[in-house]
Amino acid sequence: MQLTSFTDYGLRALIYMASLPEGRMTSISEVTEVYGVSRNHMVKIINQLSRMGYVTAVRGKNGGIRLGKPAGQIRVGDVVRDLEPLSLVNCSSEFCHITPACRLKQALAEAAQSFLKELDNYTLADLVEKNQPLYKLLLVE
Protein backbone atom coordinates (compact mmCIF):
# COMPACT_ATOMS: atom_id res chain seq x y z
CA MET A 1 0.00 0.00 0.00
CA GLN A 2 1.40 3.37 -0.96
CA LEU A 3 0.17 6.56 0.66
CA THR A 4 -0.73 9.53 -1.49
CA SER A 5 1.73 12.42 -1.55
CA PHE A 6 -0.89 14.46 0.34
CA THR A 7 -0.81 12.04 3.28
CA ASP A 8 2.96 11.54 3.02
CA TYR A 9 3.67 15.27 3.24
CA GLY A 10 0.99 15.74 5.88
CA LEU A 11 2.79 13.22 8.08
CA ARG A 12 6.14 14.85 7.32
CA ALA A 13 4.83 18.28 8.27
CA LEU A 14 3.50 16.90 11.56
CA ILE A 15 6.81 15.13 12.23
CA TYR A 16 8.65 18.40 11.63
CA MET A 17 6.40 20.32 14.01
CA ALA A 18 6.67 17.55 16.63
CA SER A 19 10.48 17.72 16.36
CA LEU A 20 10.64 21.41 17.23
CA PRO A 21 11.41 22.56 20.77
CA GLU A 22 8.30 22.90 22.95
CA GLY A 23 6.24 25.95 22.02
CA ARG A 24 8.26 26.90 18.92
CA MET A 25 6.15 27.96 15.98
CA THR A 26 7.13 27.30 12.40
CA SER A 27 5.82 28.49 9.05
CA ILE A 28 4.55 26.81 5.93
CA SER A 29 7.55 28.29 4.10
CA GLU A 30 9.92 26.66 6.57
CA VAL A 31 8.25 23.27 6.20
CA THR A 32 8.29 23.49 2.40
CA GLU A 33 11.96 24.44 2.46
CA VAL A 34 12.87 21.48 4.68
CA TYR A 35 11.10 18.97 2.43
CA GLY A 36 11.41 20.67 -0.95
CA VAL A 37 7.67 20.60 -1.57
CA SER A 38 5.49 23.04 -3.48
CA ARG A 39 4.21 25.80 -1.22
CA ASN A 40 0.73 25.60 -2.78
CA HIS A 41 0.56 21.87 -2.07
CA MET A 42 1.71 22.37 1.53
CA VAL A 43 -0.83 25.17 2.11
CA LYS A 44 -3.63 22.75 1.17
CA ILE A 45 -2.20 20.08 3.45
CA ILE A 46 -1.76 22.43 6.43
CA ASN A 47 -5.28 23.81 5.94
CA GLN A 48 -6.69 20.28 6.04
CA LEU A 49 -4.61 19.37 9.10
CA SER A 50 -5.79 22.57 10.77
CA ARG A 51 -9.47 21.80 10.07
CA MET A 52 -8.93 18.38 11.66
CA GLY A 53 -7.30 19.83 14.77
CA TYR A 54 -3.83 18.41 14.20
CA VAL A 55 -2.36 21.86 13.52
CA THR A 56 -3.06 25.26 15.04
CA ALA A 57 -2.46 28.33 12.91
CA VAL A 58 -1.77 31.63 14.65
CA ARG A 59 -2.10 34.82 12.62
CA GLY A 60 -0.11 37.99 13.06
CA LYS A 61 3.46 39.17 13.41
CA ASN A 62 4.47 36.41 15.81
CA GLY A 63 2.18 33.85 14.20
CA GLY A 64 2.85 30.58 12.50
CA ILE A 65 1.82 26.98 12.77
CA ARG A 66 2.32 24.34 15.46
CA LEU A 67 0.79 21.08 16.55
CA GLY A 68 -2.83 21.44 17.65
CA LYS A 69 -2.36 18.95 20.48
CA PRO A 70 0.57 17.19 22.15
CA ALA A 71 2.56 14.85 19.91
CA GLY A 72 1.81 11.98 22.28
CA GLN A 73 -1.91 12.38 21.57
CA ILE A 74 -1.63 12.24 17.77
CA ARG A 75 -1.74 8.65 16.55
CA VAL A 76 -0.25 8.00 13.12
CA GLY A 77 -3.19 5.73 12.26
CA ASP A 78 -5.68 8.51 12.94
CA VAL A 79 -3.80 10.93 10.69
CA VAL A 80 -3.66 8.39 7.86
CA ARG A 81 -7.38 7.58 8.30
CA ASP A 82 -8.24 11.27 8.13
CA LEU A 83 -6.06 12.11 5.12
CA GLU A 84 -5.97 8.96 3.03
CA PRO A 85 -8.73 7.64 0.79
CA LEU A 86 -8.47 3.94 1.58
CA SER A 87 -10.45 2.39 -1.23
CA LEU A 88 -7.83 0.04 -2.62
CA VAL A 89 -9.80 -1.11 -5.65
CA ASN A 90 -12.67 0.24 -7.73
CA CYS A 91 -15.32 -2.41 -7.19
CA SER A 92 -18.28 -1.15 -9.11
CA SER A 93 -20.00 -3.39 -11.61
CA GLU A 94 -19.46 -0.62 -14.13
CA PHE A 95 -15.71 -1.34 -14.04
CA CYS A 96 -15.59 -5.02 -13.11
CA HIS A 97 -18.04 -7.70 -14.14
CA ILE A 98 -17.17 -10.06 -11.23
CA THR A 99 -18.14 -7.51 -8.55
CA PRO A 100 -21.35 -9.31 -7.49
CA ALA A 101 -19.38 -12.47 -6.56
CA CYS A 102 -15.96 -11.07 -5.73
CA ARG A 103 -14.51 -11.35 -2.23
CA LEU A 104 -11.36 -9.36 -2.95
CA LYS A 105 -12.87 -6.07 -1.76
CA GLN A 106 -13.56 -7.54 1.70
CA ALA A 107 -10.06 -9.03 1.93
CA LEU A 108 -8.49 -5.71 0.99
CA ALA A 109 -10.69 -3.81 3.45
CA GLU A 110 -9.58 -6.15 6.24
CA ALA A 111 -5.93 -5.70 5.23
CA ALA A 112 -6.33 -1.91 5.26
CA GLN A 113 -7.88 -2.06 8.75
CA SER A 114 -4.97 -4.19 9.98
CA PHE A 115 -2.55 -1.66 8.50
CA LEU A 116 -4.29 1.22 10.28
CA LYS A 117 -4.55 -0.73 13.53
CA GLU A 118 -0.77 -1.22 13.47
CA LEU A 119 -0.22 2.50 12.81
CA ASP A 120 -2.43 3.24 15.83
CA ASN A 121 0.38 1.82 17.98
CA TYR A 122 2.53 4.86 17.13
CA THR A 123 2.15 8.51 18.04
CA LEU A 124 4.10 11.45 16.67
CA ALA A 125 6.00 11.47 19.96
CA ASP A 126 7.11 7.88 19.34
CA LEU A 127 8.51 8.93 15.98
CA VAL A 128 10.43 11.99 17.14
CA GLU A 129 11.39 11.82 20.82
CA LYS A 130 15.11 11.37 21.45
CA ASN A 131 15.70 10.88 17.71
CA GLN A 132 18.93 12.82 17.28
CA PRO A 133 19.52 11.63 13.69
CA LEU A 134 16.09 13.05 12.75
CA TYR A 135 16.78 16.37 14.50
CA LYS A 136 20.07 16.64 12.63
CA LEU A 137 18.44 15.96 9.26
CA LEU A 138 15.66 18.47 9.99
CA LEU A 139 18.16 20.99 11.39
CA VAL A 140 16.20 21.37 14.64
CA GLU A 141 18.91 20.42 17.14
From Swiss-Prot:
GO molecular function, one term: double-stranded DNA binding
Keyword rRNA-binding tagged: no
Organism: Klebsiella pneumoniae subsp. pneumoniae (strain ATCC 700721 / MGH 78578)
UniProt xrefs under HAMAP family: HTH_type_NsrR
Annotated keywords: 2Fe-2S, DNA-binding, Iron, Iron-sulfur, Metal-binding, Repressor, Transcription, Transcription regulation
InterPro entries noted in UniProt: TR_Rrf2-type_CS, Tscrpt_reg_Rrf2, Tscrpt_rep_HTH_NsrR, WH-like_DNA-bd_sf, WH_DNA-bd_sf
Gene3D superfamilies: Winged helix-like DNA-binding domain superfamily/Winged helix DNA-binding domain
Gene from which this protein is expressed: nsrR
UniProt name for this protein: HTH-type transcriptional repressor NsrR
